[in-house]
């Protein structure tokens, strides 16, 4: 029996090595920030498979614009976005293929869509980020940020550039309507730019409070000693799975599937947590930030949010000007 098991194990290992050995060439991946994570994932995948990774890194808006420009001549195999609703839009447009990735049974419930086309390998949440020199203490709920004491101190990322903020605005409007966001806009809320520019405005003290700031940026900056703090308001926030997807036009489909498998590996998920993102697997926890179960959430109707997300993002920018 022992000899049989040894032979069986050897066969399994050889099969896995053979499958890996069959991979060659390259895979092209479009990924949002953080850039350090993208580089580490690419290096890890190449080390594991021998497949070269060509990358394009940008905001969700920049990635979508590039995909549109390349529509007649597809380059990308795998696309990762910071917006689940934009991933749903790609599926709706018939641009994705279905696949069952390795470790699918360990993925957080709901972070793989019903058609197995969107794979939430990580996630971020948005919260209230504040400069502790300008505002020493803060715990206000979203609606309370419209109070006169915060006039001229509010900023929000551009939801037409930030996928995370776009989904927050859609989720908040779908759940609570426009009154709170309009009141914050009337209180002088400004839009400095995408996530990085918006956080910079708070870090430098140009404004004191960032509404709907993406959390991993805050945790990373705090670890570097910046005078920042973050909390998730009691009214709830949007936790945004970051969908990795295989394009139906992928020139390197087998390599694309292998890359998706790698994203859910122990190694890749550890890299995710080191980048201050929430891991896509429920069996892996963070030690450097709040875990999923610690974050109050808005009940998200993603289909309803998809229907209003683009219009809501444009409207938010309009009322903040």
Task: State where each predicted segment sits.
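An extracytoplasmic/periplasmic, membrane-proximal ligand-sensing/linker region
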Residues: 176-179, 280-321
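A ligand-binding cleft/hinge motif common to bilobed small-molecule-binding domains
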Residues: 85-89, 208-227, 276
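Extracytoplasmic ligand-binding site segments that recognize negatively charged/polar headgroups
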Residues: 28-39, 58-62, 74-207
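Short, low-complexity disordered leader/linker segments with a strong preference
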Residues: 1-26, 321
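Mature extracytoplasmic/periplasmic domains
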Residues: 237, 247-300
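A bilobed periplasmic-binding-protein/Venus flytrap-type ligand-binding module shared by bacterial periplasmic
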Residues: 127-134, 170, 240-252, 271-272
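Periplasmic-binding protein-like
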Residues: 124, 182-185, 191-192, 225-248
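Immediate post-signal peptide segment of exported/extracytoplasmic ligand-binding proteins
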Residues: 20-28, 43-49, 147-149
């Amino acid at each position: 029996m022992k000899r049989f098991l040894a032979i069986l194990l050897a066969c399994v290992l050889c099969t896995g090595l053979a499958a890996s050995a069959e991979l060659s060439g390259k895979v092209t991946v479009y990924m949002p920030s953080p850039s350090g994570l993208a580089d580490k994932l690419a290096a890890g995948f190449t080390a594991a498979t021998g497949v070269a990774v060509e990358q394009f890194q940008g905001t969700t808006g920049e990635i979508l614009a590039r995909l549109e420009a390349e529509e007649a001549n597809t380059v990308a195999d795998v696309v990762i976005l910071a917006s689940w609703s934009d991933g749903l839009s790609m599926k709706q447009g018939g641009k994705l293929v279905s696949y069952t990735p390795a470790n699918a049974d360990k993925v957080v419930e709901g972070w793989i869509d019903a058609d197995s086309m969107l794979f939430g390998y990580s996630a971020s949440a948005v919260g209230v980020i504040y400069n502790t020199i300008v505002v020493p203490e803060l715990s206000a709920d979203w609606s309370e940020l419209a109070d006169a004491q915060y006039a001229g101190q509010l900023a929000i990322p551009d939801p037409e550039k930030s996928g995370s903020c776009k989904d927050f605005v859609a989720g908040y409007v779908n759940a609570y309507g426009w009154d709170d966001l309009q009141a914050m806009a009337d209180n002088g809320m400004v839009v400095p730019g995408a996530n990085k520019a918006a956080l910079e405005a708070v870090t430098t003290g140009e404004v004191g409070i960032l509404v709907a700031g993406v959390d991993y940026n805050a945790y990373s900056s705090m670890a570097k000693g910046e005078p920042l703090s973050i909390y998730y308001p009691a009214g709830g926030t949007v936790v945004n799975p970051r969908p990795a997807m295989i394009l139906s036009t992928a020139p390197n489909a087998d390599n694309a599937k292998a890359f998706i498998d790698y994203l859910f590996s122990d190694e890749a998920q550890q890299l995710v947590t080191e980048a201050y993102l929430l891991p896509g697997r429920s069996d892996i926890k963070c030690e450097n930030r709040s875990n999923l179960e610690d974050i109050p959430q808005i009940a998200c109707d993603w289909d309803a949010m998809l229907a209003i997300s683009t219009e809501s993002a444009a409207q938010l920018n309009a009322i903040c000007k």
